[in-house]
Amino acid sequence: MERTLLNPPPSLRSPACRTTTATRIRPSSSMATMIPTPPPMRHARLVKASAAGRRELHAPPIAPPILLGLRSPAAASYGRASGGGGRRRGARVVARMGFDMFTDKAIKAIMMAQEEARRLGHHAAGSEQLLLGVIGEGTGIGAKVLRGAGLSLKAARAEVEKMAGRGPGMVPMEIKFTPAAKNVLQASQEEAHQLGHNYVGSEHLLLGLLREHGAALVVLKNFQADPSNIRSEVIRMISDTSEDHQPVSAAVGGGSSTTKIPTLLEYGTNLTKLAEEGKLDPVVGRQNQVDRVVQILGRRTKNNPCLIGEPGVGKTAIAEGLAQRIAAGNVPETIDGKTVITLDMGLLVAGTKYRGEFEERLKKLMDEVKQNGEIILFLDEVHTLVGAGAAEGAIDAANILKPALARGELQCIGATTIDEYRKHIEKDPALERRFQPVKVPEPTVDETIGILKGLRERYEIHHKVQYTDESLIAAARLSYQYISDRFLPDKAIDLVDEAGSLVRLRNAQLPDEAKELEKKLKKIMAEKSEAIRSQDFEKAGALRGEEVELKSEIMSLVDKSKEMSKAAVDSGESPGPTVTEADVQHIVSSWTGVPVEKVTVDESSRLLAMESSLHRRIVGQDEAVTAISRAIRRARVGLRDPRRPIASFIFAGPTGVGKSELAKALAAYYYGSPEAMVRLDMSEFMEKHTVAKLVGSPPGYVGYAEGGQLTEAIRRRPYAVVLFDEVEKAHPDVFNMMLQILDDGRLTDSKGRTVDFKNSLIIMTSNVGSGVIEKGGRQLGFAGDGSGDGGYGVIKNMVEEEMKRYFRPEFLNRLDEMIVFRQLTKLEVKEIAGIMLAEVTGRIGGKGIGLQVTERFKELVVEQGFDPSYGARPLRRAIMRLLEDTLTDKMLAGEICAGDSVIVDADGDGNVVVVGRRSAGLPDLKSPAFTV
């Protein structure tokens, strides 16, 4: 892109421009003559030159000199102006800047500088914004050197804002550059030219910043960063590597580099150097695996270990441990002095648009490794080699590397999961034989505790908290017990990390006084913005002063609070923020939904009163309610077997006595919601081909991608009641599937994932033996108002014998308890009637109608709804017929309206009588009315 400029005023001309008005400046390709640009300025008009395929900016006659406000620096380049356009008031002066020589990282730094200026509300970007851009770019040599000097983007931003302040807002679309910034850009080109580079990178921008005595140098000195030391470090790093070997406009894949091992360091990371600098986490344990890797690396040929293990067991940590050993000199002479470099395969493949580019990169990398002779490549996710870079007519990375791997010319450590190794590596026997597998097992809980203690210091420094030993032990044990689909030590480390974040956030809140000032500050900033919009700049200036004062007060309060906390910690009065076992338990509960926190006093009383609470919904059936309550208390206190489900029951008995209702009541009362119940109607699994729906359809069948009805429900909510209703109706193959659920608390779905049932309560209902119960009903005493315990024992034994004939012994033997439900007595049915009538009262009360029923009506309902063979369901039908249908007819006829209160009674003939409170002549009720 070319910028064509009018002749500036004499006071603003460079010495080269003052010779004559007709003089054109023709700078070299590596250096641009930068002309200061006084405000105000207009945007130039962009037209495309047809002859040379360039773009020219033809400034109108009154246009000022060059704007370096680049909308798209990556596409910009400055060239000589064409002859068109004519001259008015003198000749045009061309300032040409070779942006085609700037690397992607340098362009990114320049664009970020413009954004930093926009963020601060400034109309132009200065040298201080260029400094922020170099830091913010993050990956270039300039950013690395500045980070090493102690500058972070956040701290540098705060320093620049404190020094330069904020602008008035209303930032133009195009951010210009100050004269100082232009001098920096020119100086960066001069530095590149002096170093013999045909490109300008972020390192050259930093060298240019060090030459310009401006705001950027002031910022550096405020951070006690010595410019001479920074310059020396930049030169040293440039001699080792280069962030880009081609300018932006150069042909892809062309050119050559003058660096020692550029491809390796461009596409990889030096783990040995990171280990020497102490930037790698310590590796605890894994002695056997590291020794085995060293042993394989010492072979003459095929000296390529491949670490195979589940995700998160620490395969990458073994490579880092090897790098730490090499850095410490604690290795045999066969690999002493070698360098471990981890290769980024994604970065190696990225950008290879044309055929042959990927192969050229890979061959260049292999040549560098061979020439150096002291390089050990670490390929994380080594299975990505298979197929990497393979386009039509090309070969993939694995086939390119095979000869070198077999001859021992290339030493490589691979790491991949068991599944990926089987799918990709084992499928290619020629590739498999070149790698020597090293199995990396999941560490035990005790080994994980040791790993966490080794990492403790790193996480304490990062989160600025302290970890107790109990919290680390809890993280290892709870993650092993409750997080089933991941592996140690990864899941335990994540628990420790998130618990530290939780405690830090909890203790990082502003003081109360600072919070009030923060609210006031937000209000003032809103008023200032409104004043700027209404162009009341006098008011905006006054508000700006208040804003600065408030920010200063808030900062002083925060600093004072931090100093007090630090003083308390240093003096021993306060231990500082500490991660405890309870914090780790809280994180586990939030991840899994399983309550693992210690039982509180309120929960203890609720657990002890569980029977009475369940009896509000379940009438009778004391044995079942007691067994359920015992299982829940045992699990909550932590005395149950952690390898099995909370409990597994089978409820047997006649229909309508409360088997399914007890499971619903338990889910609503203890688990907090009726939705915390996975209910499967086993009549849906009567046929053989439907059994697979529990764990998911096999591959190739409809529904394979959806997963199983049972396994997916438990994966989403592991802490729940699982109700298998009418279990005797299921196909016999279902019981084979239940064996491992009842015994081991686990089930494998169709995709090979293990689903954990260890935090579920398994309840199965069955009508097996209901005939025996009905025949022996009078022995149970349902004809009267009591129940005979002796008769119940006889009937229970008979039902258990019936179940043994129906179910297999290996199935019944895995159940915790078989509970036989009693038939309902008339007194129990009357109590259930009160519960059902209360439900109807609540529903009609929602419509604004009060309802009372008499004792006589209640007896009528019980009389018509009592059937010992069918339980409570006939009672529900009687209430529907006698009460709900009668009230419905009255409401539709307009006899009962919202706001009325009605009494429902029964006459001597058993007919239902409904009387409204507003109607005259209420009948003389022989039985008193009561509110349900």
Swiss-Prot record:
CDD domains: AAA, RecA-like_ClpB_Hsp104-like
Protein name per Swiss-Prot or TrEMBL: Chaperone protein ClpC3, chloroplastic
Gene: CLPC3
Known function: Molecular chaperone that may interact with a ClpP-like protease involved in degradation of denatured proteins in the chloroplast.
Sites where the protein binds ATP: 309-316, 653-660
Any one annotated GO CC term: chloroplast
Keyword vocabulary terms for this entry: ATP-binding, Chaperone, Chloroplast, Nucleotide-binding, Plastid, Repeat, Transit peptide
Principal location class: plastid
Matching InterPro entries: AAA+_ATPase, ATPase_AAA_core, Clp_ATPase_C, Clp_N_dom_sf, Clp_R_dom, ClpA/B, ClpA/B_CS1, ClpA/B_CS2
Renumbered residue ranges of the record's region Repeat 2: 177-240
Any Pfam family matching the protein: AAA
SMART domains assigned to the protein according to its UniProt record, in alphabetical order: AAA (SM00382), ClpB_D2-small (SM01086)
GO MF annotation list: ATP binding; ATP hydrolysis activity
Lineage: Eukaryota, Viridiplantae, Streptophyta, Embryophyta, Tracheophyta
